[in-house]
Amino acid sequence: MTSSNDIRATFLDFFARNGHEVVPSAPLVPRNDPTLMFVNAGMVPFKNVFTGHEHRPYVRAASSQKCVRAGGKHNDLDNVGYTARHHTFFEMLGNFSFGDYFKDVAIENAWTLLTRDFGLPKEKLLVTVYHEDDEAASLWKRIAGLPDEKIIRIATDDNFWRMGDTGPCGPCSEIFYDHGPSIPGGPPGSPDEDGDRFIEIWNLVFMQFLEEPAGVRNPLPRPSIDTGMGLERFAAILQGKHDNYDTDTLRALILASAEVSHTDPDGAHKVSHRVIADHLRATSFLIADGVLPSNEGRGYVLRRIMRRAMRHAHRLGMREPFIYRLVPALTRQMGVAFPELPRAEALIVETLKLEEQKFAVMLERGLSLLEDEVQKLGSGEKLPGAVAFKLYDTYGFPLDLTEDALREQHRGLDHEGFTASMAEQKARARAAWAGSGDAATETVWLDLRDRLGGTEFLGYSTEESDASILAVVVNGAPAGRAEAGQEVALILNQTPFYAESGGQVGDTGTLTAPGVTIRVTDTQKKAGDLFVHYGTIEEGEIAPGNSVHAEVDHARRGAIRAHHSATHLLHEALRRALGPHVTQKGSLNAPDRLRFDISQPRPVTGAELRAVEREVNARIRENAAVETRLMTPDEAVKRGAMALFGEKYGDEVRVVSMGAGDAGRSAYSIELCGGTHVARTGDIGAFRILAESGVAAGIRRIEAVTGEAALAATEAETDLLEEAAAALKVAPAELPARIAALLEEKKRFERQVAELQRKLATGGAAAEIEEVAGIKFAARNLGEVSPRDLKSLADSILKSMGSGIAALVSTAESKASIVVAVSPDLTSANNAVTLVQAASGVVGGKGGGGRPDMAQAGGPDASKADEALAAVRALIKP
């Protein structure tokens, strides 16, 4: 059987032999394309090449592109698992010509590859062409020898491709495979075309027009080719399958799911195994490409995919995290073709496991609430949209999971009601936001940006300059003038002040003119590239058109530069210490500290932190030059620069390099960055890590300081050690041993105290045994005795009595803890649970629990401990 890996290799090798550049798959997160959530087709990474906005050193390309369709126009999520060919993740094989060859070569390449290299029988193939594309029909007849009946003309948009309302467009030609008359379905264009007999395997797009406004089409001067073949669909044909989920890669994941869950891969749980196999691929590749689960944007879509898979794991009977255990099986199948998968495997596993743990709690609660609501419905009645929205909004239960659960019961959902509830909530949120004044202020910045243009930033080369005031904003509105004492927001024509972005805080400083001083307390970026200087006029008055001298706080900027450059060294040191899965997830570069968030599935150990700290300080001591160059994003990435996930880059980027290179790299750290940096690494001075913590699933935070702050942190720790050593009368080096000895001594004393308390409690209780309704009863308020000792004390008292009831109360930590013990011969009339619940009510508790012979409870009101014991006494029956 031809494996999926072999098919991919054969496809790419064929086009490499035919002069194509084999381009690695781009990440699933599109670069500089806000119109797309994820890459959803093979041509997406080449979009700017087709439109002429980007130039590459080749005119022919081939790729196997990772794609995800799980939102927006291309949303296959709801169908995944229930059909033979729907997926959230798939591979798109494609070849592309950027103004080089056109229809004839594209058709010849496709026909040769399919019939010669892959060995498909010619009689099994037929094609469609756009009904006006006589040229393509003629070429298919000449090159492939296809008769007219196997060249089907289609008049719909299915055979005419557009990039958008305007832009490149052109006719398509689709190649179909005929499974034969034993499979139901008709040829494309027929009433039965939705059957499975004729399967589209390859789409050739002939970009030959430019769509202008008003629907005018003009010929492109250099026509191009874009083709796409779904690997999973094509593998099914070559492997003799009628279902993509029966192909080697997906089948291996289905079998792994069945093995771990101890269920039949093809029985009642068939759909669930298919969903898990598909969603495992989408989840793993998205995490490998930098997406982590969250409640917004791409992270939200990822979480939806993950939770749908987890819902099906629940249907398999899995109550513990399970899907994360399938990641190694995926890496074995696809890790060679996509090395980012094994690199990020640890992060994928840990992220999945944490999400599964959290989701298990939410799922049980959500399904229980949903079942309660369904019980209220009549036969065939839809679930009200307001109920579904409450599950979604209040309990975090996704709508698609509600729909999945209802589908199993053959019930519908009131989508209109859900949409209405969602709209009501958004309206409330909009009203609250508009009332805050933020909406009006944002409009001001947009209007000023349209009128004044962007601000020219001079701060890379200077920290002071002359400038003109273009606008004065007071209380969120443009003003003609402002005077001493007023808080203002100013727009200048040019500025040395850095506006907060990329994790670096905004500059502070002064704006001065004769008789005028403005203290700038912050600089922010609005409406894209409008720099807003916030501050207070200390003397004089200002108006638009005035000239000022802008001067940044030099010492503060220097400290910020040091921290920002240190984050670059820290980033690389962490990647080398922990692995290439480490990527930046957030940062703060302030004058007094730095904060750096990374993708990392587990806490960073103390030993690892010390190694990273030593590495960064070694690079600082090198005192290597920090170099900044401007280049295209593609050139930067080729040079080894790290492009940060979520950042938007223009046609030209700043690449910051620092530290001596090794292992074929031109520098130790190479990153795309728009911030300000030191001139040499030695200018950082020193580096000290202060803390490491978790901030979200799969994300760890490093906090550190540089320069004098790093030295101060070291001195403070030294002073603390010396103070502790002096208090314990040992040398600092002997502190660990002395502390260990003290802790052991403390444990010994605690054991002795507990034993003395136990003896006092049991001894005193024995002396105070009373008789109630003919039954021995011992009741004691034990004060500060630990609540965890109450059960053993009650048991000891009961043993000393032989037959009877013991009730004990602890008031440690100003709370009442109660235990009631009843000998077995008395439990039929005196249940310990009933007795302790009565006591709990007295001290403000909400009940209690346990067994008929031993139960415990508690409450916040320790002052009523004796009354609680009296409540037990009052309920004792003979």
Swiss-Prot record:
Cofactor, free-text remark: Binds 1 zinc ion per subunit.
Record has Ligase as a keyword: yes
InterPro entries xrefs: aa-tRNA-synth_II/BPL/LPL, Ala-tRNA-lgiase_IIc, Ala-tRNA-ligase_IIc_anticod-bd, Ala-tRNA-synth_IIc_core, Ala-tRNA-synth_IIc_N, Ala-tRNA_ligase, Ala_tRNA_ligase_euk/bac, DHHA1_dom
Pfam families assigned: DHHA1, tRNA-synt_2c, tRNA_SAD
Presence of keyword Transcription regulation: no
Binding site for Zn(2+): 564, 568, 673, 677
Sections of the chain in a coiled coil: none
GO MF term list: alanine-tRNA ligase activity; aminoacyl-tRNA deacylase activity; ATP binding; tRNA binding; zinc ion binding
Keywords: Aminoacyl-tRNA synthetase, ATP-binding, Cytoplasm, Ligase, Metal-binding, Nucleotide-binding, Protein biosynthesis, RNA-binding, tRNA-binding, Zinc
Domain of life: Bacteria
First-level EC class: ligase
Localization of this protein: Cytoplasm
GO biological process: alanyl-tRNA aminoacylation; negative regulation of DNA-templated transcription
Assigned GO CC terms: cytosol
EC number per UniProt: 6.1.1.7
Reactions accelerated catalytically: tRNA(Ala) + L-alanine + ATP = L-alanyl-tRNA(Ala) + AMP + diphosphate
Co-factor requirement: Zn(2+)
UniProt function note: Catalyzes the attachment of alanine to tRNA(Ala) in a two-step reaction: alanine is first activated by ATP to form Ala-AMP and then transferred to the acceptor end of tRNA(Ala). Also edits incorrectly charged Ser-tRNA(Ala) and Gly-tRNA(Ala) via its editing domain.
Domain notes: Consists of three domains; the N-terminal catalytic domain, the editing domain and the C-terminal C-Ala domain. The editing domain removes incorrectly charged amino acids, while the C-Ala domain, along with tRNA(Ala), serves as a bridge to cooperatively bring together the editing and aminoacylation centers thus stimulating deacylation of misacylated tRNAs.
Recorded family membership: Belongs to the class-II aminoacyl-tRNA synthetase family.
Name under which the protein is recorded: Alanine--tRNA ligase
Native organism: Acidiphilium cryptum (strain JF-5)
